[in-house]
Amino acid sequence: DIILKVRAPEKSEFSKIKLGQHIISFIWPGQNKALLDSLKKKKVTVQAMDMIPRISRAQKMDALSSMANIAGYRAVIEAGNQFGRFFTGQITAAGKVPPAKVLVIGAGVAGLAAIGTAQSMGAIVRAFDVRPEVAEQIESMGAEFLMLDFDSDGTGEGGYAKPASKEFIKKEMELFRAQAPEIDIVITTALIPGMPAPKLWPAEMVGLMKPGSVIVDLAAEQGGNCDVTIPDKMIETKNKVKVIGYTDLPSRMATQSSNLYSTNTRHMIDDLTPEKNGVPYVNMEDDVIRGATVLHNGEITFPPPKPKIVAIAKHTNEKVKEKTPEEISKEKIEAEKKSGRLQAVLLIIGACLTWYIGMYAPAEFMQHFIVFILSCFVGYQVIWNVAHSLHTPLMAVTNAISSIIIL
């Protein structure tokens, strides 16, 4: 009654599909309209694992993220296999080996996995994404976020990117053109739902790369981000750049992929059978089920309604107005005046407190008390005048000086 698959049904399998059957698999309905029309004739209900919305409640069944995570990791492994040098820099008796420079285009799940893997292997990692809110994620993983000086936000719906304007693409190409000659490994991961993969690394960029460089195109199955990518093949260009267009990267880690995908599909079945009676119920009011359902009893329900939640962009490329020397000088004078007033108030309070204690305390106590106050003041001045950069490596010395003065 229910068929669980990885890839969409093939033509040779159509004859085996029964009327009214339930199919759960990757479908890619945006690129496979003919497939939807063929399945419609069978009056089947189809949940596309690639159409599950990117919301928190659906993470447990988000097969795209699971497979993208594996693909991003494996992309770095495949690149390292074809790359002729170390990822990390080394200084040996035979000479100095520079670290590999890796550029990751697209900082989704696959991109972040690739960044983390390359960074852990010692490479210098740079990353680019049209969505400004991912800059913090990239930098938190130790990579450099390549910022475009362009007032535009590429954030789309459901956590994906949206198509960019011609002006933005022009600026983007200028950035990549500057990066291409010095980058050793390029990993492209950019996809737009329901559309062919955007062309982000044209043949011109490939020609600018050094001999021995490697390009891994994770969007090869959807047309590729690189002009010269051939799906399912690895080619070498005239200038000795290797371009990897494998579309089965998750299958190259079959055990891990099977475990994650089976968990995703199990959670999908759990949501389809809320009564736990084994009978699937397609609740079209449920955002997750509605988003994944592309055929319902033979009726095409693709595309789903737009997601209600859109990521809030963080504009990190806003220019900060620089202060003039006059403004800086004025602020400094104001700060000194404020500090002076505060010190005067504290001295008056301290003097009053000392006088009050002296009225009732024994003479011996007052002698010790005054010495203690003076030692605190001297200690404060000594420690405060130590350069800030020395405090951390010399923390033991700093503490020792403080203790000696107090004693």
Annotate each language-model stretch with its function.
Residues 50-92, 99, 220, 226-316, ...:
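Adenosine-phosphate binding glycine-rich loop
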Residues 2-77:
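Phosphate/diphosphate ligand-binding glycine-rich loop within oxidoreductases
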Residues 18-50, 185-236, 240-244:
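ADP-ribose/adenylate-binding Rossmann-like module
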Residues 369-371, 392-403:
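Cytoplasmic-side transmembrane-helix entry/capping segments in multi-pass membrane proteins
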Residues 1, 8-9, 156-186, 190-203, ...:
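A structured beta-alpha segment of the ubiquitous adenosine-cofactor-binding alpha/beta core
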Residues 88-179, 332-336:
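Glycine-rich phosphate/diphosphate-binding loop of Rossmann-like nucleotide-binding domains
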Residues 173, 326-353:
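Membrane-water interface at loop-to-transmembrane-helix junctions
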Residues 363-375:
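Structural signature of hydrophobic alpha-helical transmembrane segments
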